[in-house]
A protein has these predicted regions:
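Hydrophobic residues in well-ordered beta-strands that form the structural core
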Residues: 43, 133-135, 215
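Conserved residues at beta->alpha junctions
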Residues: 39, 133-136, 197
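Short, surface-exposed loop/turn motifs that are enriched in glycine and acidic residues
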Residues: 110, 131-132, 168-172
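Short glycine/serine/threonine/alanine-rich loop segments
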Residues: 66, 95, 129, 188, ...
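N-terminal helical cap/lid subdomain that shapes the substrate entry/recognition surface
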Residues: 11, 16, 26-35, 40-119, ...
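Catalytic-core regions built around general acid/base machinery
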Residues: 119-128
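Asp-based, Mg2+/Mn2+-dependent phosphohydrolase catalytic module
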Residues: 2-30, 125, 138-139, 143-263
Length: 263
């Protein structure tokens, strides 16, 4: 892992530094990569997740006037049940969702907290097809992380939790309706989508829709399972480097994943 700072130089080679995301009409059958953010594109368990969890618990204590143990129970229970604590809090309690997201994703020194793989920009840039970020985090935080990692411009769009809601309710991964609507808006087929994600529950739910699934385990905390390959996972990788086209194994993985997206 390496620390990114504002003064760090991008690890894109010169031709890729000039590269811009194409806005032309998408090619039918091109892979559509859906990258999770936390613990996928960077190591959130190192410092960011502990701070978010602490802030969430404190917010619940203050807003609902409950003890810490009850606040932790609500946070964990709603995350497991709905995919994001925000959904449970807004459905069952008088919580302002925007204030909650702002409060729990504010950091005194985000660059110092970030850890990411070396060569991340090169890995993402050389993958074939279209690339999106699909995260249950708020947009401001997601874009701040991507900017610090020098990879924001490599993604066609950042789909954050604010974009997942409809007129009636907030939604988040692993909601099926949200993913269908998201891909339809992107003019992308479900069969072309490949989700790269650390949360097995999200992969399991979305595999039912027929998308490709990549389970990344290298950033997961020690108490979570990281071995084996469940039936709903097409590929298990420890590092995004496993998808590098410059290596034989990476070419094989990408070939198997993208072969399924052909018309």
């Amino acid at each position: 892992m390496s620390t990114r700072s504002k003064t760090a130089t991008p690890d894109l080679p010169a031709p890729l530094r000039r590269r811009r995301v194409s806005r032309s009409r998408p090619r039918a059958g091109a892979p559509v990569w859906l990258f999770d953010l936390d613990n996928t594109l960077h190591h959130a368990s190192h410092a960011i997740f502990p701070e978010i969890n602490r802030a969430m618990t404190q917010y619940i204590i203050d807003a609902l006037q409950v003890e810490r143990a009850e606040a932790d129970r609500l946070r964990n229970g709603y995350t497991e049940r709905y995919g994001a604590a925000l959904l449970g809090l807004t459905r069952h309690h008088p919580i302002d969702p925007h204030d909650f997201l702002r409060a729990v994703h504010t950091f005194s020194d985000l660059p110092a907290m970030l850890r990411a793989e070396r060569g991340l920009a090169r890995i993402v840039a050389t993958l074939p097809g279209r690339k999106f970020v699909l995260t249950n985090a708020p947009e401001n935080y997601a874009r701040a992380v991507l900017r610090e990692l020098r990879i924001e411009r490599l993604f066609e769009r950042v789909i954050a939790i604010e974009h997942m809601r409809d007129r009636r309710t907030w939604r988040a991964k692993p909601d099926h309706t949200m993913l269908r609507r998201t891909l339809r808006a992107a003019n992308a087929r479900m069969a072309d989508a490949i989700l790269v994600e650390d949360t097995r529950g999200h992969l399991k739910r979305y595999k039912r829709l027929g998308i490709g699934t990549v389970w990344i385990t290298g950033h997961l905390p020690g108490h979570l399972p990281t071995t084996g390959r469940p039936h709903y996972v097409d590929h298990r990788i420890r590092s995004l480097k496993s998808l590098r086209l410059g290596t034989r194994s990476g070419r094989q993985k990408c070939s198997r994943l993208t072969r399924r997206t052909k018309p």
